[in-house]
């Protein structure tokens, strides 16, 4: 039999919208998703899916249930078959037991009772309450996250309420002495942070001591309910906000989460003192949010951010990394009323791929040519995980970080373009650009270049040697669709049918050159305002000025 805890974990981890949308076409409608019911014939949509609560309901035929029941009904599978199919699809390990089919209601109830005892103790301990308030926590936050305190009185509370001690040992609330047949409080003299499953059941605890010599934080030991490699602190309170905002902030500490929620960042969660692991991904991916890693800027924080970014980059997740330097962290910034500064920092993450490349470059002594060569091989090896389009996007960054020639990375260096002229025509010097006032608008120019590429696909090989999608401000999606050969994209079809785009024989190179010129002119304005270091800014500015000069002389220059 499959353990009940294993089934609960699967349901808490998978996204019902992702499950059902692979069978029927779901459309967003308010806070829910709607579709025509797959279980009876209808013309208007009456089948509703609630992503937050994880269930579906049809107002027409009354069909309802969770992800497992949907797969059972749609594919005509047994309960176990549907479970195993979902577990295989989402890479979730199921636990089996040959004996009794366990129901963990008693376990959840016990942990909830213990959590209540901890809460009562905290409100009778002014010293510990004062500590939390000095850290910036309000009473409302302390109550919302149900913080508590473990004192010797908890033993009396357990006895008084007749709680099952053997169960509490299994669940990690109590420990048992090896030498004496006695139990002891595992979290004695610690501030208690109850840890919840995504469905808001207490499954364990984290405990913080104020003593100097003891381990600052300890968690419940691994058990049938508590798996710290897949749980996320605060997720049960954050999940609805994550779905609505399409963004999740991952921090390193319990206090960070509580203070972020208190300051209005209610989409914040934390790992349980562990690195981000593949086991966290199913939960993090629910609702397809942008993932922001909010880590300390010390060596440990940078290394943790690097490992997490490697994983998230390969998963091609949206988001990035924010490192807090100079011993700052979100909790300190909120306590010091620097909320606007924090908002600004969180709005400027470093994309995962870029962060990985910068970290790799920083791991080598780049003054040594052999070290630089090793760095280049590692960075290019990492980029091989991605499409050619993404590789071309990031190769110029590698060139900048390593101060390496572009051709080493397979990027075409600036060259003079030699146009083809029929023998009947006299070759003229490449035409220089007229004054800016006579130039077409950037949007029109972008349309024109893409139209040329649609009309003559052989030009695309030439184009990608010089430009990438970052050149386009208005038509980036169209260029990406073209590179991915999505020729039935409605926006590409519209460009192909646009009668207001005058194409001239042999005119593509001139328009491409003009588009690249406009890009480098923007760079001259944007680079000084960028977060790059001074030396990096100087490198980019010098290259932009040189490129503009060559473009105005009629040469094609690679970006």
Swiss-Prot record:
It is an enzyme of class 2 (transferase). GO terms for molecular function: DNA binding; DNA-directed RNA polymerase activity; zinc ion binding. It catalyses: ssDNA + n NTP = ssDNA/pppN(pN)n-1 hybrid + (n-1) diphosphate. GO terms for cellular component: cytoplasm; DNA-directed RNA polymerase complex; primosome complex. Coiled coil: none annotated. Mg(2+) 2 binds at residues 296, 298. GO terms for biological process: DNA replication, synthesis of primer. InterPro entries: DNA_helicase_N/primase_C (IPR016136), DNA_primase_core_N_sf (IPR037068), DNA_primase_DnaG (IPR006295), DNA_primase_Znf_CHC2 (IPR036977), DnaG_bac (IPR030846), DnaG_HBD (IPR031988), DNAG_N (IPR013264), DnaG_primase (IPR050219). Mg(2+) 1 binds at residues 252, 296. It comes from the Bacteria. Residues 246-327 form the Toprim domain. PROSITE patterns: TOPRIM (PS50880). Keywords: DNA replication, DNA-binding, DNA-directed RNA polymerase, Magnesium, Metal-binding, Nucleotidyltransferase, Primosome, Transcription, Transferase, Zinc, Zinc-finger. Its cofactor is Zn(2+); Mg(2+). The keyword S-adenosyl-L-methionine does not apply. A zinc finger (CHC2-type) spans 37-61. CDD domains: TOPRIM_DnaG_primases (cd03364). Binds 1 zinc ion per monomer. Gene3D superfamilies: 3.40.1360.10, DNA primase, catalytic core, N-terminal domain, DNAb Helicase, Chain A, Zinc finger, CHC2-type domain. Its EC number is 2.7.7.101. Monomer. Interacts with DnaB. RNA polymerase that catalyzes the synthesis of short RNA molecules used as primers for DNA polymerase during DNA replication. Contains an N-terminal zinc-binding domain, a central core domain that contains the primase activity, and a C-terminal DnaB-binding domain. Belongs to the DnaG primase family. This is DNA primase. It comes from Helicobacter pylori (strain J99 / ATCC 700824). The lineage of its organism: Bacteria, Pseudomonadati, Campylobacterota, Epsilonproteobacteria, Campylobacterales.
